[in-house]
């Protein structure tokens, strides 16, 4: 079967060769192209190229001539008429150049005759830097060399190795760019001291060159295989003793180790001899991830190092933390006896933590007495608690991992800004790039020597909603008056920066604001309320969102102008620190509608305007405009009322204008002292009452009622205070409810009708008939006869003004009295009727109804 496959392969090769020969014959069937001296020449040599036509291969008999053209690639270089052409060519470049000969029988068509390739190259250079290597004890010998310059020709390299006992190994490299070759033989360890010689020879069409012989022994060329199965062991789970283990080839005598932390770029190197796959490392750091690699060598001076082994990565065990926490605090008063203490601390570095920090222990205690007041364990880097304001307090914070705790950091809780003399001066913040700020200050003028250290504190001024900005701080010695801060610094964010000067248990502070980069704000403030307060306008607004402020805001501007006005708006510029979210304006005119809006400014420019709000100041009249007229009117009124005649008229007018519903009832004469002092005889009164009851009409047959109206003109005047008092006349005013026993009716008078209707067209004063003693009656005679008085008659002796009396019409003519022709007078008072002052009458002992007009609101004579 193998012979059959081999025969088929040979037949296929033979057929391909025949086809190639046939193709060549077919290509050059009209003529030949010859090259002298050779198709391969050295650089700078000349060559002769000839082209000739074969018999009967020229132009047709009708053609007048044969024209042969020689092309170098696609460019004509020579033309000749006839059956042959010959030309010498010089200056050919390195590499291969194609020449083609063509026949032209007419002006348009050219026929390809034949062509030739000429190769230009150089003689091979002597190979240099010949070296050989055998990888591992069971590897094969491989040699490498430097070829030198390119010959641009096909060059063959032959490697020949000569050993003891006339042993020779030879192998040729057919690659065009051959610079290494594997002999495929293994030199065994039994001949470690045997000497070997190797050389390489380069051959091409222009010549050959051989390298210098290279002699070596097995130890010189054998490169051990990299160590494998690397592992590490920590004795007692401690980093103090670490053992690195690996496996090697048997002939290895020397090892080198390198290791480094993962985040480091430099290696720690260790050389060990005859290690036998084991080495102890004593300088590893706790809780650190390391990378380990190992290399091997067979001899101290001969041979080469093996390649580095694959990396081993592992983390060392934890150890107790070292170092102390960097602690800072904030103090805030809540009320008169409580304060809030917020402690902050920074994480320990990996070299200080020496493990995973599980928690922090916080202790607060009073300085006096030293008793522990509060202890807490937290996993965060901050802690807040409320403690009393009494006494001096101190705090201690320590970090703990699985192996132990660090030393506590102790700090006294003092008023950081309580001492004004310790406050640093001229605190400034300047940008130092996209994420850095340089803070500078000057020491306090009067307490420079007392300052023990400075603390620079910063935090974002306007964090997002619901966010607590991280607090950053750093300590600075007293001789350093600047600090470069870069922790949590972002561009286009405003930071509040505070510098504290500490001296024992006292401190002073000063602050500023700064940003690393700034632009004009992206939006303006939003006005949320406009209110009027004491003639001025109070404008309140919402802060611009922190991400749209684009740096520290330096000023706010409030613009306003009248609505529908084309004039330039007025403005008020407010420094940021003075009014963070409200400001009054007192230059607006009352009852004018204004349009208001706001902008904000940073060091880079002004923001777009915020929302517009309309507002009209209602205003209040100036109190001075009312005070002067009021005083004038008061003076005039006092002057007018001081005159008696005007005062009387004014009071009469006021009494006349007083509504009826606000007046109180007139006292009932039936309840007077006179009625009780002179009682009516019971028998006659009873007879009179019986007669009245018998003559009283039934409701079915009402009798017509005739009412005589008595109109009396009166002239009211005020009585002077020197007139005799009411007591001198023996009269008084007293209000009582009229009982049936004190009331009498005339036998000839009809019973009292119902109250008059609205059809009468006027108000009527209703009265009852009053029983009275005659002029001859005496107080000691209770059986004196009943005297029926006229309707219009009222007794004046020890009598009272009537009230709540039914109207009783009179059928008798009014009794004339000489006093009726005299001017009628009445004494008025501004007091209510229930407290009327006693009146003095000039009517003698009798007062008739034609002299008296009584209403619910006045009493006139």
UniProtKB/Swiss-Prot annotation:
<feature type="domain" description="Fibronectin type-III 1">
    <location>
        <begin position="126"/>
        <end position="221"/>
    </location>
</feature>
<keyword id="KW-1015">Disulfide bond</keyword>
<keyword id="KW-0677">Repeat</keyword>
<dbReference type="GO" id="GO:0019955">
    <property type="term" value="F:cytokine binding"/>
</dbReference>
<feature type="domain" description="Fibronectin type-III 2">
    <location>
        <begin position="226"/>
        <end position="319"/>
    </location>
</feature>
<keyword id="KW-0675">Receptor</keyword>
<feature type="glycosylation site" description="N-linked (GlcNAc...) asparagine">
    <location>
        <position position="347"/>
    </location>
</feature>
<feature type="short sequence motif" description="Box 1 motif">
    <location>
        <begin position="662"/>
        <end position="670"/>
    </location>
</feature>
<feature type="domain" description="Fibronectin type-III 5">
    <location>
        <begin position="521"/>
        <end position="620"/>
    </location>
</feature>
<dbReference type="Pfam" id="PF06328">
    <property type="entry name" value="Lep_receptor_Ig"/>
</dbReference>
<keyword id="KW-0472">Membrane</keyword>
<dbReference type="GO" id="GO:0019221">
    <property type="term" value="P:cytokine-mediated signaling pathway"/>
</dbReference>
<keyword id="KW-0325">Glycoprotein</keyword>
<feature type="signal peptide">
    <location>
        <begin position="1"/>
        <end position="23"/>
    </location>
</feature>
<dbReference type="GO" id="GO:0008284">
    <property type="term" value="P:positive regulation of cell population proliferation"/>
</dbReference>
<feature type="glycosylation site" description="N-linked (GlcNAc...) asparagine">
    <location>
        <position position="376"/>
    </location>
</feature>
<feature type="glycosylation site" description="N-linked (GlcNAc...) asparagine">
    <location>
        <position position="129"/>
    </location>
</feature>
<feature type="region of interest" description="Disordered">
    <location>
        <begin position="722"/>
        <end position="760"/>
    </location>
</feature>
<keyword id="KW-0732">Signal</keyword>
<dbReference type="InterPro" id="IPR003529">
    <property type="entry name" value="Hematopoietin_rcpt_Gp130_CS"/>
</dbReference>
<dbReference type="InterPro" id="IPR013783">
    <property type="entry name" value="Ig-like_fold"/>
</dbReference>
<dbReference type="InterPro" id="IPR003961">
    <property type="entry name" value="FN3_dom"/>
</dbReference>
<dbReference type="GO" id="GO:0009897">
    <property type="term" value="C:external side of plasma membrane"/>
</dbReference>
<feature type="topological domain" description="Cytoplasmic">
    <location>
        <begin position="644"/>
        <end position="861"/>
    </location>
</feature>
<dbReference type="GO" id="GO:0004896">
    <property type="term" value="F:cytokine receptor activity"/>
</dbReference>
<dbReference type="Pfam" id="PF00041">
    <property type="entry name" value="fn3"/>
</dbReference>
<keyword id="KW-0597">Phosphoprotein</keyword>
<keyword id="KW-1133">Transmembrane helix</keyword>
<feature type="region of interest" description="Required for STAT4 binding">
    <location>
        <begin position="800"/>
        <end position="806"/>
    </location>
</feature>
<comment type="similarity">
    <text>Belongs to the type I cytokine receptor family. Type 2 subfamily.</text>
</comment>
<protein>
    <recommendedName>
        <fullName>Interleukin-12 receptor subunit beta-2</fullName>
    </recommendedName>
</protein>
<dbReference type="GO" id="GO:0042022">
    <property type="term" value="C:interleukin-12 receptor complex"/>
</dbReference>
<feature type="modified residue" description="Phosphotyrosine">
    <location>
        <position position="800"/>
    </location>
</feature>
<keyword id="KW-0812">Transmembrane</keyword>
<feature type="glycosylation site" description="N-linked (GlcNAc...) asparagine">
    <location>
        <position position="271"/>
    </location>
</feature>
<feature type="glycosylation site" description="N-linked (GlcNAc...) asparagine">
    <location>
        <position position="166"/>
    </location>
</feature>
<dbReference type="InterPro" id="IPR010457">
    <property type="entry name" value="IgC2-like_lig-bd"/>
</dbReference>
<feature type="domain" description="Fibronectin type-III 4">
    <location>
        <begin position="423"/>
        <end position="519"/>
    </location>
</feature>
<comment type="subunit">
    <text>Heterodimer/heterooligomer; disulfide-linked. The functional high affinity IL12 receptor is composed of I12RB1 and IL12RB2. Il12RB2 binds JAK2 (via its N-terminal) through a membrane-proximal region of the cytoplasmic domain.</text>
</comment>
<feature type="short sequence motif" description="WSXWS motif">
    <location>
        <begin position="305"/>
        <end position="309"/>
    </location>
</feature>
<dbReference type="InterPro" id="IPR052672">
    <property type="entry name" value="Type1_Cytokine_Rcpt_Type2"/>
</dbReference>
<dbReference type="GO" id="GO:0043235">
    <property type="term" value="C:receptor complex"/>
</dbReference>
